[in-house]
Amino acid sequence: MPEPARPATASVPVEGTLLAFDYGEKRIGVALGNTVSRSARALETIPNRSVDFRFAQISRLVGEWQPVGFVVGMPVHPDGEEQPMIKLAKRFGNQLLGRYGLPVTWVDERYSSIAAQDAGASDDVLDAEAARIILQQFFDEHA
C-alpha cells in the first residue's frame, strides 16, 4: 500500500492568506483563501509552459497576495492508489517550499476537477475552480 501524501512541512499556518494549486502538466489552477474567514475563491489559471514561466507567474502572485503558506492538490486514484501525476505534484510542492520557504500542505484532490465540472465551471476557469475546491476542502478539514 502506498504511503499517504505528507505535507512538505508539518506546520499549518494559523492565520493569513493561502494560495492553493491544482497542478497539471498543461495548466495550473490557482485559488486564494484566508485562514480567518475560511473561504476560498478561484483566482486564475497559469499555463504550465516551462519552469521559468510557471514560477514567474507564481512569484507575481506571491508578491501580490503575500501568502503564509501553500496548499497543493494530490491526485490520488479513487481506490487510494497513487496516480503517475502524484510525483509531479509532489515535486511542484517541494519546489514551492524551496523557492519561497513557506509551508506546503497537500490535500487529496481526487474529485476536485469533477466537482468543478459539475458546478458548471467553463473550460477557461475549470482548473482555478478545482484549486478553489481543494482549498475549501483544506479549510473544512482544519476547522
Swiss-Prot record:
GO terms for molecular function: nuclease activity. PANTHER family: POLYNUCLEOTIDYL TRANSFERASE, RIBONUCLEASE H-LIKE SUPERFAMILY PROTEIN. It comes from Ralstonia pickettii (strain 12J). It is found in: Cytoplasm. GO terms for biological process: rRNA 5'-end processing. HAMAP family: Nuclease_YqgF. Its EC number is 3.1.-.-. Could be a nuclease involved in processing of the 5'-end of pre-16S rRNA. It is an enzyme of class 3 (hydrolase). Keywords: Cytoplasm, Hydrolase, Nuclease, Ribosome biogenesis. It holds the Pfam family RuvX. SMART domains: YqgFc. One of its GO terms (cellular component) is cytosol. This is Putative pre-16S rRNA nuclease. Belongs to the YqgF nuclease family. InterPro entries: RNaseH-like_sf (IPR012337), YqgF (IPR005227), YqgF/RNaseH-like_dom (IPR006641), YqgF/RNaseH-like_dom_sf (IPR037027). Its main location: cytoplasm. It comes from the Bacteria.
